[in-house]
Regions:
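Short S/T/G/P-rich N-terminal loop/turn motif that feeds into the first structured element of a domain
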Residues: 1-158
Length: 158
């Protein structure tokens, strides 16, 4: 791990870019990311400038439910999307915390813009009621947090 045992190269890089972004190692929290399908399967979410709109829902499993139940529902969700997905770019994933928290998982939705998010959400409200009911049997989520998002760094050679 580069942070726990930094190499001279890492220290030089960190010093060179210290004014770009600072990571508070003490304040970072690890997550395991569950990526259920190819991110580009419903179009390109991220624009050329790295921008995308995101929403995250903090969720807890209902009594007797677990990640196994969620994964089974995600298989059904993928089938739903294949048959009924809207025409706007969309991508999603699940974050499981690797630290003590009151939240069992975060559900993330990513869209090309807030306009396409609105179109996709309207389509979901009209056509996704049965699938939403399956998710509701498994977990309870609070209202989403919305973010203007950007990719900070992507090196395809690493």
């Amino acid at each position: 791990n580069a942070f726990a045992n930094p190499s001279p190269e890492f220290l030089a890089w960190s010093d060179k870019y210290s004014d770009v972004m600072t990571c508070d190692i003490e304040g970072r929290f690890p997550w395991t990311f569950y990526l259920p399908r190819d991110p580009g399967s419903f179009g390109e979410v991220m624009g050329e400038n790295g921008y995308f709109a995101s929403e995250f829902l903090a969720c807890n499993f209902n009594e007797g439910k677990s990640g196994k139940d969620l994964r089974a529902a995600v298989v059904q969700f993928n089938e739903y999307l294949d048959q009924n997905g809207s025409e706007v770019p969309y991508f999603y994933g699940v974050y499981y915390p690797q630290f003590e928290t009151d939240t069992d998982f975060l559900w993330g939705n990513w869209h090309a813009s807030f306009e396409t998010m609105e179109i996709g959400n309207k389509d979901w409200e009209e056509n996704g009621k049965a699938m939403q009911a399956k998710f509701d049997e498994i977990s309870t989520c609070i209202s989403p947090d919305y973010y203007d998002s950007r990719e900070l760094y992507n090196n395809p050679n690493t």
